[in-house]
């Protein structure tokens, strides 16, 4: 099925799609065995494009992709089986205003992020609007890159957030530091592992290395998105 426009995507993505095809069509290195493309954009105009191939990517492809990257003012990643070539960077930084504050999020290619920034902002505002019933400490399971964690942290004494993806944990740690938030800690545990740790059935070196002592927390709220 031919698709020249995808209305669910941002206007920036829709504008870039035909430009990307037109530029790539001029280069055999870029167009041959080009299988798929993924876009990650931000409200401020950052654009990360992942070009996926059914061939081995070599130096000639890199030269052509660098020229495309410069011409379209985007960041390009090339992927093939067993290959990931990052020409500039493998992330974008999104800024979302929630209430009276801007929150900055590093969103890494290949990891889960909320796909619609405008809807995401509404989700965050909705969650924060329930704060009157909150207090104490927050436990968030599977926090991703800290999407909800950051704004919710303003309404709790301490926040412990769990996540199993190393990539998402890394992004969440960056986001915490970039937003100057001091009451959040991230534990790389599944929900089952957290339960084992919290009930004392099992000890995890990961918690000790992160300086997390579960008895320091008095959880009043559990949050799962």
Swiss-Prot record:
ATP-binding among keywords: no
Alphabetical UniProt keywords: Methyltransferase, S-adenosyl-L-methionine, Transferase, tRNA processing
Top EC class for this record: transferase
Catalytic activity: uridine(54) in tRNA + S-adenosyl-L-methionine = 5-methyluridine(54) in tRNA + S-adenosyl-L-homocysteine + H(+); uridine(341) in tmRNA + S-adenosyl-L-methionine = 5-methyluridine(341) in tmRNA + S-adenosyl-L-homocysteine + H(+)
Pfam families hit by this protein: tRNA_U5-meth_tr
Disulphides: none
Assigned EC number: 2.1.1.-, 2.1.1.35
GO biological process terms, semicolon-separated: methylation; tRNA processing
GO CC aspect terms: cytosol
Lineage top rank: taxon: Bacteria
InterPro entries: SAM-dependent_MTases_sf, TrmA_MeTrfase, U5_MeTrfase_fam
Residues that hold S-adenosyl-L-methionine according to the record: 114, 142, 147, 163, 225
UniProt GO molecular function: rRNA binding; tRNA (uracil(54)-C5)-methyltransferase activity, S-adenosyl methionine-dependent; tRNA binding
Family classification: Belongs to the class I-like SAM-binding methyltransferase superfamily. RNA M5U methyltransferase family. TrmA subfamily.
Task performed by this protein: Dual-specificity methyltransferase that catalyzes the formation of 5-methyluridine at position 54 (m5U54) in all tRNAs, and that of position 341 (m5U341) in tmRNA (transfer-mRNA).
Protein name: tRNA/tmRNA (uracil-C(5))-methyltransferase
Organism: Neisseria gonorrhoeae
């Amino acid at each position: 099925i031919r698709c020249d426009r995808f209305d669910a995507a941002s206007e920036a993505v829709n504008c870039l799609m035909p430009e990307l095809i037109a530029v790539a069509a001029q280069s055999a290195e870029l167009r041959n065995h080009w299988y798929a493309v993924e876009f990650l954009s931000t409200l401020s105009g950052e654009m990360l494009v992942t070009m996926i191939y059914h061939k081995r990517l070599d130096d000639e492809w890199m030269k052509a992709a660098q020229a495309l990257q410069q011409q379209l003012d985007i960041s390009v990643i090339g992927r093939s089986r067993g290959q990931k070539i990052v020409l500039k960077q493998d992330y974008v930084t999104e800024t979302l205003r929630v209430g009276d504050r801007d929150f900055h999020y590093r969103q890494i290619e290949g990891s889960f992020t909320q796909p619609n920034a405008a809807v995401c902002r509404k989700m965050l505002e909705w969650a924060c609007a329930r704060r009157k019933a909150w207090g104490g400490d927050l436990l968030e399971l599977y926090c991703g890159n800290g999407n909800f964690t950051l704004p919710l942290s303003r309404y709790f004494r301490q926040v412990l957030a769990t996540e199993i993806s190393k990539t998402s944990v890394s992004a969440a740690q960056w986001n915490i530091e970039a937003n100057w938030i001091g009451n959040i800690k991230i534990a790389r545990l599944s929900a089952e592992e957290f339960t084992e740790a919290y009930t004392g059935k099992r000890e995890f070196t990961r918690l000790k290395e992160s300086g997390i002592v579960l008895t320091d927390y008095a959880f009043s709220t559990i949050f799962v998105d």
